[in-house]
C-alpha cells in the first residue's frame, strides 16, 4: 500500500467517525441541575447506542449529576462545550467508580466539557490542610479494565475521589489533550495510572495533582503476566507535589519500551487556588518529590526506557532510579531475587533549583545496568554541612522507594551505588552558593564513563568526584569554570582500572586504603 493511499485513509477516518449516530441524553429524560440524579437516563443512552452498533452519547451544556456509568463497546461519551458530568456526592449512588468499562472495545470520552468526581464529599480535613478519606469512596473516577481501542481526548477532569484515570490491562490507547486539575491537598489523587497496558500514547496533556501525575505500575495478580510495554508520553505539562513521571511503586511483571519526551515538570505556586498545603512562612513553591522516578522493588524487569527533552523547575529530586527488594504491595512476599533495571537513556534534561541529588541505586548483590545520561544541566541548592560530606548512606534494602528517602546525600548532583555500565556525557552542574560536597559519587560501580563533567566555581570541597570500590572507570574532558582540572577522591580497597585522561596526577586525592599508583593510570593528551 503506497503512502498516498495511507494518507487518504487517515484523512477519511475522522469523517467516518464523525458521521456515526448520536444519542443525546436529553432524549432519554436526563435533566440538568444538582437536584436531579441522571444515572439511569445516561446509562439508557449508552446501552441503546452500543446495541445499535455504536456512536456518540452526547452530554449537552449544563450540569448533569450521575452515579456509576458503564461504557460499552462502540460508545464514545461526548461532552459538549459547557457540559459538566458531576459525580454524585452520595456513596449509595455508585456500584464502583464514576465511569467504568470492562472487556469493552472501541470506546472513549471526548469533547470540551468537564468530568468532576465530587471528591470533597468523601474527604475530611486531617492536618495542615491535608485531607483523608473518612468513609469508603466510590472508587476511581474513570476505570477501564481489559479494554481495546480507547480514545480519551479534549476533556477536563477534576476532583476525583481517588485516582483520576486508571487503565488496567488495556491496549491500543490514545489519551490526548486532556486537562486534569486536582487539589494539591487531596488523598491519592493520581492523574493517569497505566497498569499492565500495551500500546499507549499520552500526548499534549496538562496535569496538576497532589499525587503521581503519570504513573506506570502493575500490582494486580490477574495481570502480572501481561507486560506494560510500548508506552509513550510526550508533549505534556506535569505539576505535582509527588512524582511527575513514574514507573512504580507497585512493579510485578515486566515494563518494556517506555518513552517520556518533550515535556515540562512544573512546581505549584502557593497562590494557586488548588495549592492550599505545605506553604511555609517563606512562601516557597510546592515542589514535586521527583521529576522522574523509575523503581523496581517487587521483582519486575524494567528494560528499555528513553527519556528526552525534559525541563524541570523547582523539583526536590530530578532523577530517581531504584532497584530494591521490598516484596510487592499485594502479597507482601519478597521475590527470591530482586528484579532488574537496564537499558535506560536520559538525554537533554534541564533542571532548575533542585533540592536533592539525583540517585541511581540498587542493593548489595544487584546492579542497575546500562544507563546513559547525556546533556544534563542541573542547578542545585547549596548545602554547607561538614558532616554531610562523609555521611554514611543506609542501604534500605526493603524500604518503600521514595526520591527523598535519604534526604540530602553526600553528593550535590549525582549519587550512584551498585551500578554497572554507566555513561555520563556532558553533565553540567551548578550550585546557587558554595558547597563542599563532590558533584558525583560512585560506590560499588563497574564500567563507568564520564566525558565532559562541568562544574562552576561554587564547588569548594576537596574533590569533584568520589570513587569507592569502583572498577573500570574512564574520565575525560572534565573542567570547572576557570579551566582547572578536577580533584578525585578514591576510597575503599577495591578501586581498579581507573583512567583519568588529560589529568594531572598531582590533583588526585586518595584515602590511605587506596593506592593511587596501583589503581589509577593517567593519559595526557
Regions found by a protein language model. Name each.
Residues 7-17:
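Bacterial N-terminal signal peptides
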Residues 18-525:
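Extracellular/periplasmic carbohydrate-active domains that bind, remodel
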Residues 1-5:
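Positively charged n-region of N-terminal signal peptides that target proteins for export
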Amino acid at each position: 500500500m503506497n503512502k498516498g493511499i495511507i494518507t487518504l485513509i487517515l484523512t477519511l477516518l475522522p469523517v467516518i467517525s464523525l458521521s456515526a449516530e448520536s444519542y443525546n441524553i436529553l432524549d432519554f429524560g436526563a435533566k440538568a441541575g444538582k437536584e436531579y440524579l441522571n444515572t439511569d437516563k445516561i446509562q439508557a443512552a449508552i446501552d441503546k447506542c452500543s446495541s445499535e452498533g455504536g456512536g456518540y452519547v452526547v452530554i449537552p451544556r449544563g450540569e448533569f449529576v450521575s452515579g456509576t456509568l458503564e461504557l460499552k463497546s462502540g460508545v464514545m461519551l461526548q461532552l459538549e462545550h459547557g457540559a459538566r458530568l458531576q459525580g454524585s456526592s452520595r456513596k449509595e449512588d455508585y456500584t464502583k467508580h464514576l465511569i467504568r468499562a470492562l472487556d469493552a472495545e472501541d470506546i472513549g470520552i471526548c469533547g470540551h466539557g468537564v468530568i468532576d468526581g465530587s471528591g470533597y464529599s468523601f474527604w475530611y480535613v486531617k492536618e495542615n490542610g491535608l485531607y483523608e478519606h473518612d468513609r469508603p469512596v466510590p472508587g476511581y473516577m474513570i476505570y477501564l479494565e481489559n479494554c481495546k481501542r480507547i480514545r480519551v481526548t479534549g476533556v477536563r477532569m477534576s476532583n476525583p475521589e481517588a485516582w483520576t484515570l486508571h487503565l488496567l490491562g488495556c491496549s491500543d490507547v490514545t489519551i490526548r489533550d486532556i486537562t486534569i486539575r486536582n487539589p494539591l491537598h487531596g488523598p491519592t489523587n493520581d492523574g493517569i495510572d497505566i497498569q499492565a497496558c500495551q500500546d499507549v500514547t499520552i500526548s499534549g496533556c496538562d496535569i496538576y495533582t497532589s499525587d503521581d501525575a503519570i504513573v506506570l505500575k502493575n500490582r494486580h495478580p490477574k495481570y502480572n503476566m501481561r507486560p506494560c510495554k510500548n508506552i509513550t508520553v510526550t508533549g505534556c505539562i506535569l505539576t505535582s507535589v509527588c512524582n511527575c513521571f513514574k514507573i512504580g511503586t507497585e512493579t510485578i511483571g515486566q515494563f518494556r519500551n517506555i518513552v517520556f519526551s518533550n515535556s515540562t515538570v512544573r512546581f505549584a505556586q502557593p497562590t494557586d487556588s488548588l495549592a492550599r498545603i505545605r506553604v511555609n512562612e517563606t512562601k516557597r513553591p510546592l515542589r514535586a518529590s521527583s521529576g522522574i522516578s523509575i523503581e523496581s522493588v517487587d521483582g519486575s524487569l524494567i528494560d528499555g526506557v528513553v527519556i528526552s527533552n525534559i525541563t524541570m523547575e523547582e523539583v526536590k529530586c530530578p532523577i530517581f532510579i531504584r532497584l530494591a527488594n521490598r516484596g510487592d504491595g499485594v502479597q507482601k512476599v519478597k521475590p527470591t531475587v530482586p528484579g532488574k533495571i537496564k537499558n535506560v537513556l536520559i538525554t537533554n534534561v534541564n533542571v532548575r533549583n533542585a533540592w536533592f541529588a539525583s540517585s541511581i541505586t540498587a542493593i548489595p548483590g544487584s546492579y542497575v545496568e546500562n544507563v546513559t545520561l547525556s546533556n544534563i544541566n542541573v542547578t542545585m541548592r547549596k548545602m554547607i554541612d561538614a558532616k554531610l560530606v562523609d555521611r554514611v548512606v543506609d542501604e534500605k534494602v526493603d524500604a518503600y522507594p521514595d526520591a527523598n528517602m535519604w534526604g540530602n546525600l553526600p553528593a550535590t548532583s549525582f549519587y550512584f551505588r551498585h551500578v554497572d555500565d554507566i555513561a555520563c556525557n556532558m553533565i553540567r552542574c551548578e550550585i546557587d552558593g558554595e558547597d563542599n560536597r563532590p558533584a558525583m559519587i560512585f560506590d560499588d560501580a563497574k564500567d563507568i564513563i564520564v566525558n565532559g563533567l562541568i562544574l562552576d566555581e561554587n564547588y569548594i570541597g576537596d574533590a569533584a568526584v568520589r570513587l569507592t570500590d569502583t572498577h573500570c572507570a574512564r574520565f575525560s574532558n572534565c573542567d570547572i569554570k576557570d579551566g582547572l582540572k578536577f580533584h578525585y577522591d578514591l576510597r575503599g580497597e577495591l578501586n581498579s582500572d581507573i583512567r583519568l585522561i588529560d589529568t594531572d596526577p598531582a590533583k588526585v586525592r586518595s584515602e590511605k586504603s587506596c593506592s593511587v599508583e596501583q589503581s589509577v593510570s593517567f593519559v595526557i593528551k
